[in-house]
Amino acid sequence: MSADNVSSIDPEKERISRERREKLAKWRAKKALMDSQNELKKETVPLEVKNSKITNNENDSTSRSKLLERQHKLQEWKRKKREREEEQLIKEQENTKETSSHSKKKNKKQNRGSQKRQITFDDSDDETTGESKDSFDKSEIVVEKSDMSGSKNNNEDDPLEAYMKSLVNGGQPLNHKIGENILDEDGDDNSIEEDDEFSNSESDEESSRYKRISKAKAKKKVKEIKFTIKDLEPFPKSFYSEPDEVKLMTDDEVEEMRLSLGGIKVKGKHCPKLITRWSQLGLPTDIMNLITKELKYDEPTAIQSQAIPAIMSGRDLIGISKTGSGKTISYILPMLRQIKAQRTLSKNETGPLGLILAPTRELALQINEEVEKFTKQDRSIRTICCTGGSEMKKQINDLKRGVEIVVATPGRLIDILTLNSGKLISTKRITFVVMDEADRLFDMGFEPQITQIMKTVRPDKQCVLFSATFPNKLRSFAARILTDPLTVTINSNNLVNENVNQSFYIEDNENDKFNRLVNILDGFYKVNKNITSNSEEREIDEEVSDKKIIIFVSSQQFCDLLYSKLENFGYFPYTIHAGKPYQERVMNLEKFKTTTNSILLCTEVLSRGLNVPEVSLVIIYNAAKTFAQYVHTTGRTARGTHKGDAITLLLPDELAAAYILKRALRERELSSIDPQMVEDMKQMSERFESGMKEGKYKLSKGFGGKGLDNLDTKREEKQQEEKHKLDKIENDESTPSTSYKTTDNASSSSEVDSVTIPKLEFTIDRDKNIDSTISFTAIVNVNDLPQLVRWEATKNTTLMFIKHETGCSITNKGKYYPEGKGPTSNKDQPKLYLQIEGKEEKDVLLSIELLEQKVREGIKKVEYQSIKSTKY
């Protein structure tokens, strides 16, 4: 390269460098402007948030000091940045002058020493001479590379120009690394990155982290709706008008009729009289034909005769009846009547108007099928079944089009209510809520989900609970949710269906029990085969030909094991348990329903709600451990007007099951069983009863579950067991006085049971709040109670229990004064008391009732301690 060429390049290079400096200055000015705008936005948002916090708490000096410190650091950063920019501009001007002289020397040296290869500016980094390293610093090499690469290939986009274009377009920089390569002068770019990181990282990372946490928490949480009178669209509830023949019935005749229908017991005020015929309900002709001709329900069952008039009168109801008694129709007919009387859904409304909650998928699908029988001819009422394990996309599309009735499990309904920030469906028009198998809903731990759902429904709704049992936990929930409910109980002393013939066998070991199972199956199908051997007779009586069997076992593993053993004997049952995929469970259940003389092997997952009328035999292979479980398991046969058998297979050590059988079996059933086996069963039952009196055994009262409540129960049981062992050791150490101590313990127990429990002194005041809402406050005096009782009533676990059960606020107030002392002036604190606050008076009264239960437990502890201390 000649000297003339070098001299011609130098002015061109100087021009390019000048243009780049101008672009660089413009870019920095633009970046400084954008940074200041971003910082201003970030300052205003935290300032608004901070101001809102300050209005709530004016003493939040810590937050204010942090804000001022941040603003001070930001101003300091801007000042340093301006100083760096000025220094850098001066340095660039000096470097520009040196660049021309250095490039001349460099080009001459390259022409003399590198004739074997052509040198380009892309190869300048490969030179190893000391002069080149000393002559150029890093910034000059980078600039020269970028300049020459630009001249070498004009088609390539300049990185700085691309970066400037992205800023002009309002976007973010394309790549931060490009900016680093171009502007890596004296560490300026690093300082800018550090300052940017300082200004953005703290707030951005912290806010994003809190957003993620809050979003995860709120993901499955339904927002409570605060209703006002203006928001509530009025709707009719009462549609029932007593016919003349019912009106003329006297109270004695009504009681006699209730006894004749299975011992109907009614609790509550102003309950309508029961009906005896469908025509007394005033149903439309098409519904009457469906009930009497298609469904072949000639007359109402016991629960239907009393529950339907009560619900159609607009009352909240708790229905307690045996399984297979027709509870589903008891709430379907009133729900359809109420929905038909309301305004139809508009184009912008999704519904629903009626909501039915069920504990399991199978029961929800079954209820939906029953509802569709009544709505298939009526296009104005649309239904949908929302359960887990099924495709949600189709459910969402159906819900968007609008539905009048939703049948769902609580978990899937929570998922739907939280979709799209709760905007998918609206619960404002729900006026009728049903909880079927309510006790099972609570046993499975759905109470929190149901409580969330009920907070989104209008308070003047009509709510109905149906169940086969009514435990205390469900009772307290019903007191919170239902308004002045009626309780209808059908034959509460004997919940086993009258159409079920019960029997049992006691076997010595598992092998004998399995052989007994095979003999039962062989005998059953042999008899059934003889009955249906004639094909013409089979066509005439199809019900006799299809005899299905359900075998209940205790666990998934045992279910699979028993299936393998039965398969070796030529039986191929369909198996269903929670360990199988949902689609396989549905398919096996459908095959069981459609296949003649089929066998179903399952766990207790299907002990409730399964309705297959052709089931004529239920075999309880692993004996039920609770009475409720036995009731529901035997209820899978003898559905409606059909008859069926229930056989229990026992082992000698299953004492609890023998105790349940003794209470459940009727005299006519005992007379048909081997007398020796009946005697063995009674002895096992007596052993269990005596063990319960001694504290050795305890009969379970529910299906169990997990959670804190169950852990507390287990802990108490363990403590009682350890206490029993300790008492037994004490008795063994003093054998001469064993008989005396037994008598003493009996008398002690009677003394404790005969303790009179004092009623708590309390007053309830009605308060009107600033926002015109009404609240109730109760003052309960606990100062004068015995010490242990006072501790029991005021300890934290008691207060948290009451708050959880009732939703009321309960706090300790005042000061404890010994007996005979009290406050002497108005300045002194009052005697120790509990203050209970709630929105409803019934919630406050329920809190006091639960508190009295805790006081009763405390009184018994006091008496027991005093008796035990004076025993010796």
UniProtKB/Swiss-Prot annotation:
A motif (Q motif) lies at residues 276-305. SUPFAM superfamilies: P-loop containing nucleoside triphosphate hydrolases. Residues 308-488 form the Helicase ATP-binding domain. Residues 1-21, 34-213, 708-752 are annotated as: Disordered. A motif (DEAD box) lies at residues 436-439. InterPro entries: DEAD/DEAH_box_helicase_dom (IPR011545), Helicase_ATP-bd (IPR014001), Helicase_C-like (IPR001650), P-loop_NTPase (IPR027417), PRP5/DDX46/KHDC4_KH (IPR056149), RNA-helicase_DEAD-box_CS (IPR000629), RNA_helicase_DEAD_Q_motif (IPR014014). Keywords: ATP-binding, Helicase, Hydrolase, mRNA processing, mRNA splicing, Nucleotide-binding, Nucleus. Its EC number is 3.6.4.13. The Q motif is unique to and characteristic of the DEAD box family of RNA helicases and controls ATP binding and hydrolysis. This is Pre-mRNA-processing ATP-dependent RNA helicase PRP5. It comes from Vanderwaltozyma polyspora (strain ATCC 22028 / DSM 70294 / BCRC 21397 / CBS 2163 / NBRC 10782 / NRRL Y-8283 / UCD 57-17) (Kluyveromyces polysporus).
